[in-house]
Each structure stands twice: as structure tokens, then as C-alpha cells.
Amino acid sequence: MAKAKFERTKPHVNIGTIGHVDHGKTTLTAAITKYFGEFKAYDQIDGAPEERARGITISTAHVEYESENRHYAHVDCPGHADYVKNMITGAAQMDGAILVVNAADGPMPQTREHILLGRQVGIPYMVVYLNKVDQVDDPELLELVEMEVRELLSSYDYPGDDIPIVKGSALAALEGRDAEIGENSIRELMKAVDDYIPTPERAVDLPFLMPIEDVFSISGRGTVVTGRVERGAVNVGDELEIVGIRPTKKTTCTGVEMFRKLLDRGEAGDNIGALLRGVERDGVERGQVLAKPGSVTPHTEFEAEAYILTKEEGGRHTPFFANYRPQFYFRTTDVTGTVKLPEGTEMVMPGDNLKFEVELIAPIAMEEKLRFAIREGGRTVGAGVVSKILK
């Protein structure tokens, strides 16, 4: 059978299921595909293949489905460690998440951890599915659990009072019984996701930014920098800034090339060469970014959420301590930095995830949600995301 082609006419949104182990994330994912996509059985989702992101192996299942209004790409991870790695590396960017909570248990440790991670890595919106409601006989108990979930969300700066909470049974939906808590709850959930999680801005509509990968000098023309446009678009004649590592410098783009052809513009996703006016060959280097003036600023100190690889994943064999000095790989280059551990943390073991502060020896064009790798001599030993800029 030929693969059905998804019509790209609908706006696209990336979401995923998060929550405590065994609260029903994968069952819910399977149930959604039953009513809105190409049906995937529990085992097909649970046996997620391993993939690599920033040198880290993660198991993630990807499913696609569509509501009346939108097309969704949905991620589900088999294990808790996979969630942590996935959220920190941004291997699967999420525009919003469905938090699954077992109504009989209420919020559990990983429920809390996933909400905290969501806040740290910048998942902007959450919708709650209160699962297994058929295991709770007392409606007052159900109300208490709902209140508890709302308070927990609010304590991590999510608007707990406004977040939609849908009650149901993913298993009933998957087995096609008890429509009230089964199929109807899935339809209600997707309506909540449609209405509450906004369509993200397209990358091409954001301010222009291109990490510089290489620099060439073309005799008689000037200096060309190459790279893949991360977001936005650049037109010939645009004023730009070169940001990071050295003092910020203004320039003008006098030409855009792609595959040796001259273009009027380059946009998100394109690999381009940009010809820059008045910039010497040694006045710009890999690791800087080319950006719309004022849209991004250079920083040296930030707070990060990071995951440290285990020995089995090719990471360190030993813990590290305060004032650890690895390299931080941002976009296209390594910059050395010093780690400041949170109070009460003496050492960090391989396999840990934690929040810490970093001071870099040179400024990098940076904003919240920017991902990086932690490296020692070119070997990846961890992954992180900027959760807050300090200086």
C-alpha cells in the first residue's frame, strides 16, 4: 500500500506526551492515533527505535495525526531518562505538551520533574489529561486531584487555573468501549489542544539569524560567510550584525549565494553564502552569528539545565566537582567555561540531570532555549539548554 501523503495545507504543531511512568502516556498516544491518525498499536509506539541527537542516544517514538484544523507531530518516550534527554537536547522540539496524570495516584515525582523540565527548557503550553478516571469512584477525590495538578502547574509558573483538564480513560478509548470516558474524552482532549496550544510562528517569520560556519575571501568582491539560516530571511541590501566572541560589528549584506547561484534572498533552512560589506577576512570567524540588528545579544554568564552522559553513553567515567571547566559547544564552536554548582551539590555523577550556572571565557550570541553540548577535547560528555541569561 502506498504511503498516504500528508497534506501540508494545515498549520503544523509539534507536541508530545509527558508525565509519570505508567500513568498512561503511550496508551493515550495510541488512542489519539486511533481516532485522528493512522492507527499505531501500543507495541509499535513502545518499541521506539534509538536515535542520536547531539551525540546522545535517545529512544523516541514519533506519530503523526491531524485534527480538523491542524497537523500534529507527536513524540512519546518509553523511559524517564529518554524524556529528560529529549527535553534537554531539544531532539524533539515541543510547541506544547499533554501532561498525563493517573487520577487514582495524582501527581507523582516524575509529574513534577517533567513540569519543571518543561519550564526550564521552554515548553510554553500544557494541557492535562486526567487518565484512568474509572478507577476513582468518588467525584470529590477527582476534584481534589484536579486541584492538586493545577496547584503544581502554578507553582512552576504555568497558568494552573486556566489550563484545560480533560478527564477520561485512554484504555477505554483504545479498546473502543465506554464512549463517555473513552472516545469522547479523546475528542475533547484534541479540541482542547487545538484551542489552547497556539500555532507557533514559522521560522521564516522570526528575526534573521545564521550561525557562521566558514569564512572566505573572494578577490574583488570581499568577504563571504557561509552557514545554514536558522531562522528568518536575509535580503540583499539588509543591514546585519556580527555577534559573539568579539565586539558586535555592523555590516551590510551585498549578495546572497546558494549552490554558486546569486539570489535576492536566503531564508530559514537554506545553506547560503552571504557577501558582507567592509568586513576583512580576519574580522569574522566561525562561532559568531550573522543576525538582524538588535535581535540577539552576546553573553558570558547563564543558568542551564543539563544532562550528563553515562559511561555507557560514551560520557565521563567519574563525577565532576565545583569549578569544572569543559568546553561548551554552541551552534558551530566550542567555548571554555566554568561550572558553578547549586548550593548543597558537591559533585555530579554521570547520568545526572541538574541545573547549574556557567561563566564562559568569551561571549556567545545567546538567548533562552538555546541548546549546547558539553565537551571535553571534542568528546561529548553532556547536553544542556540555556534556561536563564545572567550577564
UniProtKB/Swiss-Prot annotation:
Would I find Transmembrane among this entry's keywords?
Answer: no
What are the EC numbers? 3.6.5.3
Which residues bind Mg(2+) per the record? T26
From the UniProt entry, list the residue stretches annotated as the region G4. 131-134
Q: What is its main location?
A: cytoplasm
Region G3, as annotated, extends over 76-79
Q: What GO MF annotations does this protein's record show? A: GTP binding; GTPase activity; guanosine tetraphosphate binding; translation elongation factor activity
InterPro entries in the record: EF-Tu_GTP-bd, EF-Tu_GTPase, EFTu-like_2, EFTU_2, G_TR_CS, P-loop_NTPase, Small_GTP-bd, T_Tr_GTP-bd_dom
According to the UniProt record, one GO cellular component term is: cytosol
Reaction(s) catalysed (UniProt annotation): GTP + H2O = GDP + phosphate + H(+)
Q: Where is this region: G1?
A: 19-26
Where it sits in the cell: the answer is:
Cytoplasm
Describe the protein's quaternary organization and the partners it interacts with.
Monomer.
Similarity comment: family membership: Belongs to the TRAFAC class translation factor GTPase superfamily. Classic translation factor GTPase family. EF-Tu/EF-1A subfamily.
Q: What is this protein called?
A: Elongation factor Tu
